[in-house]
Amino acid sequence: MDHRRALPPESLVAMNSAASSGNPFHTDEGARAAGYERAVIGGLTTYGYLCSYPLREWGARWLERGGIDVRLRVPIVDQQPLQLSAEMVSAEIRARVEAISETQFDSMAQLPNLGPLALAVAWLGGPGPLPPWSFPVTPPAAKLSLDQLATSQIISLPSMKFTPDVAWCSATLLSTQADACDLGVLTSEVSKGDPLPPSVIIDMANLALMNALDLGTWLHTRSKTQHFTQLRCGDEIEVRTRVLSTEPGELGLVSVFELAFIRGQNVCARVEHSAIFTEGALANGPKDRL
């Protein structure tokens, strides 16, 4: 029999921090054109909300060896009241995000019985740092269009290098309504050398894809992350990306990418990142499942 223990629930109001990302869904104008009341918040923000539970339960140990599988089921709009809840089931944390009042939003009122807007399973443990993999195909020199992504045999994308600084890490914590203490930092501010907020990893993943692909309008639907060793604010990180699958779906092109986050000679984290490239496919109104 599974041992279950409820973790403290939390109420918050969704905050859109992705208005300048270039994705039309993250602006009021672009989201309204697709049938939403307000801008759709970035998936990395919801990811950050859900990471609060393993961070508070396991602290820095989770960033050293742990993982999370986040599934984004229904778009969340800016200023939407949310309820976070979770329980420990045996050795896993199972968390969810739900709407507190769907009827406050005309677009949400069209979708009865939404259920959880996002779900996550988090775990503690996993292998240590891995050696970087080698890519069998030379990355393209220019951005790929979605048509090229769908029809080409290219399975690797250009790598990209980042050095997440204090300002980046602090802004990410602010957007996910988290505090530095969630990372195991004793002060309320992030400093160079402190643990990297997990949402910064997803931010780097998005930027790496935006650097390599002409994305247009897209929806983040899933991120499965495994930490192999702790990344820190100020680290020099190379992100290498390869395409796992691309196929047509009901709402657009469905693609799955694998990204390695490399410091020095070791893969410190790996993300399986899924997205739907809609090209306006949601113009007839919001969808209740992604």
Where are these regions (language model features)?
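HotDog/MaoC-like acyl-thioester-processing domains
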Residues: M1-M15, L72, V77-P158, H227-L290
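Hot-dog-fold acyl-thioester-processing enzymes
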Residues: M1-R65, G128-R222, G280-L290
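Hydrophobic beta-strand-centered segment that forms part of the acyl-chain substrate-binding groove
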Residues: T45-E92, P198-T246, R270
